[in-house]
UniProtKB/Swiss-Prot annotation:
Protein name, UniProt field: Ribonuclease 3
Residue ranges of domain RNase III in the record: 4-133
Pfam family, one: dsrm
Domain of life according to the entry: Bacteria
Species, as recorded: Dehalococcoides mccartyi (strain CBDB1)
Length: 237
């Protein structure tokens, strides 16, 4: 058995059942060359880890972004759980060093193959989940995925509210929304603009921002929320 103390330190987890972590590192190629090994490969744990990772991020996104719609939430989750993200995290904790690989797989640089790294990392998450439970697994994931989560935060602030509002108003009212700056204040280097979104003689909402574009975007966001809330209220009648 490999000494996995360094890996445990990287994960921030001391296993009650170290055999679970070892199991998570066993590739099918190693099992093929060691048929007497009783516990098999890490594939079943990979399945569980994938599910745990998905539900933890789904829960986080749902609570962090209450104003973002299902389609965007799905896109954000996909960014977080995609193979590239898993590989980056796996490389960051030097996971490939600990993999149990068959000789041929090892010679063919299997310790650096994205599929091997991503699968083993998901299996490691399953091992943590089984050994420590959901809360500890959540803490590990949020710490290791900090960079990916910061990227999602940035993306969430750049959602095209104006396009979504236009689609909604055109579909519901057969009107095209327009924007105008109605006021501004402050010195030239630090202006605060007020914009409103309207169609014909109807004003839907207003928003503010440090640029005209930001003010228009915020006006669209407010209007979109109002429209969506009104549709929800109608559905509940």
């Amino acid at each position: 058995m490999l000494d996995l103390t360094e890996l445990e330190n990287s994960l921030g987890v001391k296993f009650e059942q170290p055999s679970l972590l070892e199991q998570a590192l066993i590739h099918t190629s190693w099992v093929n060359e060691n048929p007497n090994h009783s516990s098999g490969s890490n594939e079943r744990m990979e399945f569980l880890g994938d599910a745990v990772l998905g539900v933890i991020f789904a829960d986080r996104l749902y609570h962090d972004f209450p104003d973002i719609q299902e389609g965007d939430l799905t896109r954000f989750r996909s960014l977080l759980v995609r193979r590239e993200s898993l590989v980056r995290v796996a490389l960051g904790i030097n996971l490939g060093k600990y993999l149990y690989l068959g000789r041929g797989e090892d010679v063919s640089k299997g310790r650096f193959k994205p599929a091997n790294l991503a699968g083993a990392f998901e299996a490691v998450l399953a091992a943590i989940y089984i050994d420590k439970g959901m809360d500890v697994t959540r803490e590990v994931i949020f710490r290791l995925f900090k960079t990916e989560m910061e990227r999602v935060q940035t993306l969430s602030s750049n959602i095209d509210y104006k396009s979504r509002l236009q689609e909604l108003i055109q579909a519901q009212l057969q009107l095209t929304p327009r924007y105008r700056i109605t006021n501004f204040s402050g010195p030239e280097h630090n202006r605060l603009f007020i914009a409103e979104v309207y169609a014909e003689d109807r004003v839907f909402a207003e928003g503010s921002g440090r640029s005209k574009k930001e003010a228009e975007t915020n006006a669209a966001k407010v209007a979109l929320q109002q429209f969506e809330n009104s549709f929800t209220d109608e559905d509940n009648i």
